[in-house]
């Protein structure tokens, strides 16, 4: 998700801190010609980085973002603040908005990064869900698949909290 690994995400190398006001101020500053010129000058003077190995290694600072961690919460706050800004802009210009939650593949996509904790890991919940599905207990399997997704420490799929924020804002 962009709030975690995208430009200015809480887990990216290109972050400007976690305070939304500072981030918006820095984005506006980047629009100034002087800032763009200084950035261009810096890139010409700095040695070029080699991206052939793996772009993700360069872009992502914090690859592992555990569920309910400080970075996880910051990503949720950033998502909620960004959504509120966009919705306020649409409201100001009287533009209708249609909402949708984020769909994710629970069954066919194993957790990317499973870490052990006090409770079961993402991999353990995924395996349990597979067993529950085999036993034709689809409700329990759905719950376990959902828990595996939420515990996946590589934040490429929307957690249940993202959809809760969307529902709350709708």
Residue ranges, per PLM feature:
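Serine-dependent acyl-ester chemistry module
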Residues: 1-168
């Amino acid at each position: 998700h962009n709030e975690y690994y995208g430009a200015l995400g809480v887990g990216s190398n290109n972050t400007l801190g976690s305070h939304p006001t500072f981030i918006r101020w820095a984005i506006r500053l980047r629009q100034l010609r002087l800032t763009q010129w200084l950035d261009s000058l810096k890139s010409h003077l700095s040695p070029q980085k080699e991206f052939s190995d793996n772009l993700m290694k360069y872009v992502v600072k914090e690859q592992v973002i555990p569920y309910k961690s400080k970075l996880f919460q910051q990503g949720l706050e950033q998502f909620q603040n960004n959504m509120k800004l966009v919705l306020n802009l649409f409201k100001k210009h009287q533009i209708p908005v249609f909402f949708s939650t984020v769909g994710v593949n629970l069954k066919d996509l194993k957790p990317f990064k499973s870490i052990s904790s006090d409770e079961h890991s993402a991999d353990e919940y995924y395996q349990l869900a597979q067993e529950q599905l085999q036993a034709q207990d689809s409700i329990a399997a759905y719950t376990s698949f959902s828990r595996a997704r939420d515990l996946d420490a590589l934040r490429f799929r929307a957690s249940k909290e993202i959809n809760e924020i969307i529902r709350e804002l709708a």
